[in-house]
Amino acid sequence: VGSEMCIRDSGTVVITVGGGGIPVVCRDGKLYGTPAVIDKDFASAKLAELLDADMLVILTAVEKVAINFGKPDQKGLDTLTPDEARKYIDEKQFAPGSMLPKVQAAMSFAESKPGRVALITLLEKAAEGIEGKTGTRVQM
């Protein structure tokens, strides 16, 4: 986290925590592959928290988080509180391995400190989302 903080403090936007890699464990001085996944969304939320960021931006394939996704009554969400997100999670509104981890990571970040905001949106709409013009903002 130290090098990321130096870069951040220089005024540079930090893009990190990509996918990939092979998880291993060390036994008897040897490395062995192990079934594990480091989720990019959760890792990004944790890094943003450790960097004391005000905003976490999670980029995805849709402009907004939606309920009833893919159905005639689909509704894009402009804002989402962690409590609302939990309700929708209980209703199974978000696909596991797709939107669910993004929403959970956004909730975790938003709840980690007052005033924090997580934005979920398209790469092409990131600037507009940061300006508050689009995307889904998750905050307390």
Predicted regions and their residues:
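Conserved mixed alpha/beta catalytic, RNA-binding, or beta-rich assembly cores of soluble enzyme
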Residues: 13-55, 59
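Short, small-residue-biased leader/transition segments that mark boundaries at the very start
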Residues: 1-7
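Flexible, glycine/proline-enriched loop segments at strand-loop-helix junctions
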Residues: 3, 31-37, 90-96
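Short coil/turn connectors at secondary-structure junctions
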Residues: 9-12, 51-55, 60, 113-116, ...
